[in-house]
Regions:
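Membrane-proximal intracellular helices of multi-pass ion channels
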Residues: 1-218
């Protein structure tokens, strides 16, 4: 009996699990961004800068202290994009999807945490809803990338594939990150494509779909 009481006291609430999950992902992302392989210059980025960048990516705020396109290498950009995707989907949703892929069963407590994480109305059907969110998210992001692919490949060659994928995920997760680099000491972002109907319409639809996705889940 005393052991059961101790275990109950030590059990984390859904809110605590979500907070610790986000904090853990942010810290891991910050440490990965500190690696020399994460920058184009091959140097070590100060922890305060990588922590800020990782937090911004996971919390999808779009604030940066270094230009994402020119400062970070392909590896660093991949880390940032992964953090954006995790932040957009939610740490608990990503963890649950990995558990499902590995064939593990989701416990009732885990289902309750998933319910709180995505603001689902009930625990029943939460696993099915999570699968639906994952499939829908990846499908929409893929379609967005395919729509922008011809434009970016025309301007950047094979690198356009990565450009299309990055901006599709960033837009759908409403993250505000871009990898278009610096021109004349300015950060043009997507202003260079102000006259491109394909890029403009695709980005707008991706952002709009994200907002509708959130409202439908809630």
């Amino acid at each position: 009996m005393p052991d059961e009481i101790i275990r109950r006291k030590r059990r984390l609430s859904s809110f605590q699990i979500i907070i610790l999950g986000f904090a853990g992902v942010i810290l891991l992302g910050a440490l990965l961004l500190m690696l020399p392989i994460s920058t184009t210059a091959g140097g070590v980025t100060p922890f305060n800068e990588t922590l800020f960048t990782a937090t911004s990516a996971v919390c999808v705020t779009g604030l940066v202290v270094q230009d994402t396109g020119s400062y970070w290498s392909a590896f660093g950009q991949a880390v940032i994009l992964t953090l954006i995707q995790i932040g957009g989907l939610g740490v608990v949703t990503v963890a649950a999807s990995l558990a499902l892929l590995s064939g593990r069963k989701i416990s009732l407590m885990q289902r309750s945490t998933m319910q709180d994480a995505i603001s689902a109305p009930q625990v029943g059907g939460i696993v099915r809803l999570t699968r639906f969110i994952l499939r829908g998210t990846f499908l929409i992001e893929l379609l967005g990338a395919l729509a922008m692919l011809p434009v970016f490949c025309r301007d950047y060659g094979w690198r356009g594939i990565w450009m299309a994928l990055f901006h599709s995920i960033s837009a759908f997760c409403n993250a505000g990150f871009d990898i278009l680099g610096i021109e004349d000491n300015l950060y043009p972002s997507l202003t260079g494509y102000a006259g491109s109907p394909v890029i403009n319409i695709t980005i707008m639809l991706l952002i709009r779909d994200w907002r509708h996705w959130i409202s439908d889940v809630e």
